[in-house]
């Protein structure tokens, strides 16, 4: 059995639509990589929760060698459709654009 990775956790701004900073929490295994990566979009019927809601899922994934980016996105009633979808698209694009810096294998990126 492989020992779990030590991880680093940090918040980053990935977009700023209409002057509203959108944050993502990155969970990164320590090591040379590249690692597979996943963008995690929290549940909540598009109206509640945030990037830290599923922390109990993010940590084990990162400790197993997956870079996790859990994102915030605008939600009603503050921002109506399609704002949430647009923000999620920004998050995925940011993750892919920064894959090398984050030690993510660009051909092994998923979304959950």
Predicted regions located by residue number:
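Short amphipathic alpha-helix adjacent to the substrate-entry channel of hydrolases
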Residues: 50-70
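Alpha/beta-hydrolase active-site loop
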Residues: 79-101
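N-terminal cap/lid segment of alpha/beta-hydrolase-fold proteins
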Residues: 1-33
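Alpha/beta-hydrolase active-site loop signature
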Residues: 45, 73-77
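Gly/Ser-rich "nucleophile elbow"/oxyanion-hole loop immediately N-terminal to the catalytic nucleophile
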Residues: 33, 96-112
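Structural cue for short, hydrophobic secondary-structure segments
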Residues: 40-43, 70, 94
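Short N-terminal helix/helix-N-cap motif within the alpha/beta-hydrolase-1
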Residues: 48-52, 78-79
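Short beta-strand element of the alpha/beta-hydrolase
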Residues: 24, 34-44
């Amino acid at each position: 059995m492989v020992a779990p990775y030590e991880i680093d956790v940090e918040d980053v701004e990935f977009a700023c639509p209409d002057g509203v900073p959108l944050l993502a929490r990155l969970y990164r295994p320590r090591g040379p990589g590249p690692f597979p990566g996943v963008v995690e979009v929290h549940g909540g019927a598009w109206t509640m929760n945030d990037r830290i809601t599923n922390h109990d899922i993010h940590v084990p994934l990162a400790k197993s060698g997956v870079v996790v980016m859990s994102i915030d996105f605008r939600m009603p009633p503050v921002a109506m459709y399609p704002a949430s979808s647009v923000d999620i698209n920004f998050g995925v694009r940011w993750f892919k654009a920064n894959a090398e810096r984050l030690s993510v294998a660009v051909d092994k990126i998923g979304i959950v």
